[in-house]
């Protein structure tokens, strides 16, 4: 970027990433309306070609798929990142009558940034005065659920999870689905708003939905719903800009990121976050201790509860939907990490461990946990209770430090629930395959089925550059066992900051893992897309194969590397086997031959029946006089 470009205000120059706003091939955005006109749930409809006459010649119903891309892939919406996305939820929040609009920001740091003239060129131009719960009110989705109230957000996610399942069944898109094995989950045949309410009231699911993030398209995280994935973005002291982080956001949600965590640790964290939230249709999570550490110039010992509290309020007023809080890193657990191969690998965990040792005091996040809950329920920020002592190598998996912290997270979950604050639990990490099930079982036991949210886990440590694969294996397994959300890992894990291509690779890898888990659990409708793609593959409908896939661009590119001509996209073979050895083509020929034989057999059988009837009519005598 030139000096002249830098001098121009970002609120004047910022542009949307053009790659992120193109509709996916042969797809269109559709909206399913709820009980009121302003509940419009987005889905992506993939149109399919007719089955060729060689295969029976029939119409193929379009396939609906879950869509996280927000308005960015709707050609009817004008996207301007300088203004942010349109309002989705304000009318719902206003109707509840339990919030108030503040006259200004109430965080000291937020006010400092707002009044700093030097930041004017970087600042999002349309900063709104925040909302907060009225005195004595609790505005969390869990609180409403426990009052028996089905909110607009709950109805929205029920429609979104259900994906017009009844229509899909009627269209024959779900004639086959294998029974799943859900390890004791309570997955219904159909997701209803009442089921959503019950799950949230029980604490088995959360809808991360800060009242200050009104651009949000609500989604749900819980073991009895579709497995979700999270993508991480964020700058560091070594690089990246606000524009790049917003581009990563829009790129990530295009490919299926259900939530996004902003893990910025570099310059202008506050301003970067404002741009991200105002342009995000998915929940945004943060680790507030990262920013708090920046405020004390990276000296963990200088952190205070007062500074951290102000950081929570600052971020809650911007609209952060969930906070990772490392309140389970207790002083007594720190020595348990001394003999580990990789010690404490969590940034948040190491920060709090260092503070505890420096002051020889208990973790202030733990001692002030009730006060944190008071802040959370005033804005409906969900907890993501951080696993600060997660294993950073398979050698350290399932040790006393990890499971000791998990037990504490279970205690904290119950405290959060007493405040009607939504809560999920973060998990490892690096765990070999044979130890993954124990992690899930122990989390369900300790945390009473609160949603589990894991980083992988990575199943081996030997593949730097391929940790999206080592972790995708573990993610599929733990998703099947009951994990509600999977935090993606990119090929750059342990090596560097991911770029756009790395983000896409990580997300597609984790979409595969999450979908495989949904199939294995037996989530209703999970097999619709598989069935449609398999049918397209057998019928050599190449374009439909590409378009039904998670990444149409890559599928088309790989096909065209060896068969670039357009005629190859209607050919009844591919480059793998060629025209004479294509198993699909041979199978079709076998079917045609069998159909002919069947016709002959029917004719013969009919003739035999006629002769048999004549034999009986003539007295059933073996010999007849001529």
UniProtKB/Swiss-Prot annotation:
Keywords: 4Fe-4S, Iron, Iron-sulfur, Lyase, Metal-binding, S-adenosyl-L-methionine, Thiamine biosynthesis, Zinc. Residues 10-25 have a biased composition (Polar residues). The lineage of its organism: Bacteria, Pseudomonadati, Pseudomonadota, Gammaproteobacteria, Pseudomonadales. [4Fe-4S] cluster binds at residues 574, 577, 582. The keyword Metal-binding applies. This is Phosphomethylpyrimidine synthase. Zn(2+) binds at residues 430, 494. HAMAP family: ThiC. It comes from Pseudomonas entomophila (strain L48). One of its GO terms (biological process) is thiamine biosynthetic process. NCBIfam families: PRK09284.1, PRK13352.1, thiC. Catalyzes the synthesis of the hydroxymethylpyrimidine phosphate (HMP-P) moiety of thiamine from aminoimidazole ribotide (AIR) in a radical S-adenosyl-L-methionine (SAM)-dependent reaction. The keyword Zinc applies.
């Amino acid at each position: 970027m030139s000096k002249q470009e830098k001098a121009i205000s970002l609120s004047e120059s910022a542009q949307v990433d053009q790659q992120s706003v193109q509709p996916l091939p042969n797809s269109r955005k559709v909206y399913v309306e709820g009980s009121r006109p302003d509940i419009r749930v987005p889905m992506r409809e993939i149109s399919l070609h007719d089955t060729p006459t060689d295969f029976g010649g029939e119409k193929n119903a379009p396939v609906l798929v879950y869509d996280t891309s927000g308005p960015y892939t709707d050609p009817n919406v004008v996207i301007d990142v300088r203004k942010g996305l349109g309002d989705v939820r304000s009318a719902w929040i206003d109707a509840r009558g339990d919030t108030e609009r503040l006259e200004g920001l109430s965080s000291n740091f937020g006010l400092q940034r707002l009044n700093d003239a030097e930041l004017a060129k970087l600042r999002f131009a349309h900063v709104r005065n925040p909302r907060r719960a009225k005195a004595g009110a609790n505005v969390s989705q869990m609180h409403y659920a426990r009052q028996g109230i089905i909110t607009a957000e709950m109805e929205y996610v029920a429609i979104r999870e259900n994906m017009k399942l009844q229509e899909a069944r009627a269209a024959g898109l779900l004639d086959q689905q294998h029974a799943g094995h859900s390890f004791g989950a309570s997955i219904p045949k159909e997701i209803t708003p009442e089921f959503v309410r019950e799950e949230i009231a029980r604490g088995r699911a959360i809808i991360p939905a800060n009242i200050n993030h009104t651009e949000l398209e609500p989604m749900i995280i819980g073991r009895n719903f579709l497995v979700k994935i999270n993508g991480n973005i964020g700058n560091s002291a070594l690089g990246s800009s606000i524009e790049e982080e917003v581009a990563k956001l829009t790129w990530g949600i295009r490919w299926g990121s259900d939530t996004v965590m902003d893990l910025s640790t570099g310059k202008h964290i506050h301003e970067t976050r404002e741009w991200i939230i105002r342009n995000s249709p998915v929940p945004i999570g943060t680790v507030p201790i990262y920013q708090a550490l920046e405020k004390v110039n990276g000296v963990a010992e200088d952190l205070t509860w007062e500074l951290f509290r102000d950081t929570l309020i600052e971020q809650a007023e911007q609209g952060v939907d969930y906070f990772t809080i490392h309140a389970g890193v207790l002083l007594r657990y720190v020595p348990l990490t001394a003999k580990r191969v990789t010690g404490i690998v969590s940034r948040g965990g190491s920060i709090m461990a260092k503070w505890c040792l420096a002051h020889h005091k208990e973790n202030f996040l733990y001692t002030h946990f009730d006060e944190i809950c008071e802040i959370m329920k005033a804005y409906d920020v969900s907890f993501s209770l951080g696993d600060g002592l997660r294993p950073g190598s398979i050698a350290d998996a399932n040790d006393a430090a990890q499971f000791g912290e998990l037990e504490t997270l279970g205690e904290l979950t119950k405290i959060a629930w007493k405040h009607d604050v939504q809560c999920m639990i973060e998990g490892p990490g690096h765990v070999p395959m044979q130890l993954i099930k124990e992690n899930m079982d122990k989390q369900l036991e300790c945390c009473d089925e609160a949603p589990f949210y894991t980083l992988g886990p990575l199943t081996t440590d030997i593949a730097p550059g391929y940790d999206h694969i080592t972790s995708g294996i573990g993610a599929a397994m733990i998703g099947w066992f009951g994990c509600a959300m999977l935090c993606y890992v990119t090929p750059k894990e342990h090596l560097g900051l991911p770029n756009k291509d790395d983000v896409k690779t990580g997300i597609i890898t984790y979409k595969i893992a999450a979908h495989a888990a949904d199939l294995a659990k037996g989530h209703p409708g999970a097999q619709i897309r598989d069935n449609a793609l398999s049918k397209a593959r057998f019928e050599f409908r190449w374009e439909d194969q590409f378009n039904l896939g998670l990444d149409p661009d890559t599928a088309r590119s790989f096909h065209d590397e060896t068969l670039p001509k357009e005629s190859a996209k209607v050919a009844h073979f591919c480059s793998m086997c060629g025209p004479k050895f294509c198993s699909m083509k041979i199978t079709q020929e076998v079917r045609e031959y069998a159909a002919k034989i069947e016709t002959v057999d029917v004719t013969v059988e009919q003739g035999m029946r006629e002769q048999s009837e004549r034999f009986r009519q003539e007295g059933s005598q073996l010999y007849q006089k001529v």
